[in-house]
């Protein structure tokens, strides 16, 4: 009896998905920024995969799922939503956020647990942002961080 050929490794399938649909993919994520007063700011961003451009970002001290949903409304006005939205399994991206993503007509794609390589475009942008900007500036508050990020 012949054995059926094995399916490609999950990593290869994921990479094929990213390459084949890059024009229709956006990713969202958070990263933390320490402040001068030892507080922590959370920077939320949405990035397009095709040109690696930031579609939307905002800063908050206390991210909630309701706040994330509002940011998604601002990121995708009217019919500008991508086909797929990649995000990790962070506590802020709960079932409420997943349901609202579906209501926008976007297919949510959650990455595997502790697999930052699956959201490489977003993780790369976070690394560049830290190296090029945040390693050289001490952030005072959320307004200061927003101004720095706009530049």
Question: Positions of the model-derived regions?
Answer:
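Charged DNA-binding/catalytic regions of mobile-element recombinases
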Residues: 1-151
